[in-house]
């Protein structure tokens, strides 16, 4: 474990863990940057949409929050991220968003934005719907319960040459059994794969205090990360040796907000339809007794050449 000293009511643990920094946030919009790299790679050693889920949520949520009346508490109810240029394996990405519709009478709004890489190429497009809520701020969770924030150690990635000749289903079965490393990002979010078959996976993730937003629930960007990881794994169960996949989008409806000090979250991802080049995927995050928390949809490009070195 790595310890980072946190001044009371100072550093936001969520953004500290995810390497995110605030550049600006005002009525004109919000801008954040994130240092991406191996700590946020999937099991293939690649940066994915899930790697930038938190900074994406920060941007669209921050833009709405900054546009709302002072003192408001806000939550994102729907988050959509669409891939454009490949995300870099390492470096700096910048997420910026602004409010495109604001209805203070009903307490709702729509924000749009984008993520750009270090070369100023658009790597992802963002859209969110947010609401003003009356929930109390959970400062003791959002800013950490103690003077030190413990950051989980970075987990390993299985060398690409050990995976290149394997069918995708075998790789994902290996992750479930522990023969293949689940990757740093899954390790960071606590995503554990428990059962696998072609076109379906199930597992769980355990919330942690560092994942908290201002109202003490798991930030939507963390949930996007988990949903994207699950969608990628189920897409990989369809791939042949020497080929891989790329998730092209993530569309999340955030139905209920899981508490960071709550029970494990169940994760189930299924292929709805798969063609030769594209798979449509649905992922559900639920409570242990089956109550829906997140409904997510994704599409994944299949048949891409295997590349374990990121982009």
Residue ranges and their predicted role:
Residues 34, 79-81, 113, 203-205, ...:
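Preference for bulky hydrophobic residues occupying beta-strand positions
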